[in-house]
Every structure is written in structure tokens, then in C-alpha cells.
Amino acid sequence: MKRRIGIMGGTFDPPHMAHLLIAENSRAAFSLDEVLFIPAADPPHKQDRAVTLYAHRYHMTELSIAANDAFTLSDIERKRSGLSYSLVTVRELQKLYRAGADFYFITGMDSINDLHKWYHPKELLASCHFIGVTRLGDPVNTIALEKDFGKLACERIYFLEVPGMEISSTDIRRRVREGLPIRYLVPDAVKEYIRKEGLYLDKGDKRNAFSG
């Protein structure tokens, strides 16, 4: 029987509680045997802003998932050159697992709605399932997806409501810069790592990053 593997790709700059909620709810709802967290080495959709060093993002993700045995960290995108396209990553995972796994790409509805802009999206959708995570009560419009992907949209894209989706990495970085607390937004180990390394502060700002 094939294993069911979830893929949590992202910049994780930083990883936060919503990432963990999404991964765990997806694992439970779709009976996933494992969820792979894959920090993007060179994300194609983040070319317009500076991204924190991969080593920091990788280590923060490692700290975030340490308490869950079903979560695994992968550096598969660091090991290759070029932009971190999801299709290339999925194909590499298929080679690693051979024919022994079905993959479920976990992402937010904003990304699902922009799926037609991704690198070779039809090939990607044919290669793995997608779990589109929505906020509680948010409507799901499948008309555009069916227009772009036809039958594949019905067969390959699933939807899952998850609470706590209001947390964002962008807001956490802002809060650190402004000296506001980020406790309960990120795991304690990640909070301490950000403080220790002085991440997300303006250049030359050596003050304590946040109050807790």
C-alpha cells in the first residue's frame, strides 16, 4: 500500500503556529503518514524582497517541528541550483520514494487561486494532489479552477478549513522590528532563536528584538 505524504513547502521566514496547525489538520483529515517540511532555497515568488539566510530558516523549521513525530524536515531544495520550483521538487521526491508514495501538496487558498501562474501547473497537478487550506467560513470558488484545469481540478484539488489562519510570517517580522511580542505566534524555541540571532531587526539595530 502506498504511503500518503504531505508536502509543506514555503519560505518559513519564520515558521509559525499556523504552519503547524495546517500541517497537523491536513495530516489528520487526509490520513497522511508523514508531512515533509521543505524550506524553499530560492523561492521564485519572493524575488522582490530579501529572504533570510536558508540556514536560519532551516534551523527554525527544525525547532518548530521537533515535537511531532509525523513531521519531517527536508533540505531537498538546498541541494540543487536554480529557483525552487515545486514541480522539480515533486519529481525529485517521486524518484526518492519511487512508486511507493502519493503526494499531497499543502498550501493556502491564495496559492490555489494563483496555481495557473505556477511553473508548469498542469504537470504539477498531474503529479500530486493539492490540499487547499481555507479559513473557517470562507467560500470556495471552484469555477476558475475548473476553467484552468478542467477534470484535474475535480480529481486533484481538495479543500480543508483550518482555524488560526490569521497568523502570517510578514506580520511576525513586522512585530519583531517594532519590538512587539510574538509569543504564541511562533513556538518558544523559534522565538528564542530569533532573539538570539537578532533576526528581522533593521540593520544596525542591536536592541532586544521583542518583549516576549
For the regions a language model picked out, list residue spans one by one.
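Nucleotidyltransferase catalytic core that binds NTPs
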Residues: M1-G212
